[in-house]
Amino acid sequence: MVCGGFACSKNALCALNVVYMLVGLLLIGVAAWAKGLGLVSSIHIIGGVIAVGVFLLLIAVAGLVGAVNHHQVLLFFYMIILGLVFIFQFGISCSCLAINLSKQAGIIN
């Protein structure tokens, strides 16, 4: 059975957002696990990973609610946020490629 129109897009968007929610929960869980076992000593790194996990989880929930309810404003907000995240990731990737390893180590420290 083939789905067409918005039904197929809705199902694909719901599945994608469920995967994003699982990734967000995984990030939060791994950060808590690493902190509990003492694998990572920097609270800033743990906090950053948890913040990214929570952000991803919230955005995925917004996308899932928008797709299920066919809420156009929420889907537009979701699209804008994902576009900004893409631009941010692209900028960080270009920055990482532009500097060498010694400068990267200096920035991290």
Swiss-Prot record:
Keyword check for Transmembrane helix: yes
Pfam families in UniProt: Tetraspanin
Residue numbers on the Cytoplasmic membrane side: 1-12, 66-72
Name of protein: Tetraspanin-31
Topological category with respect to the lipid bilayer: Multi-pass membrane protein
Transmembrane segments: 13-33, 45-65, 73-93
Chief location category: membrane
Topological domain ranges for the Extracellular compartment: 34-44, 94-109
Localization per Swiss-Prot or TrEMBL: Membrane
Positions bearing carbohydrate: N100
Highest classification ranks of the organism: Eukaryota, Metazoa, Chordata, Craniata, Vertebrata
Family to which the UniProt record says this protein belongs: Belongs to the tetraspanin (TM4SF) family.
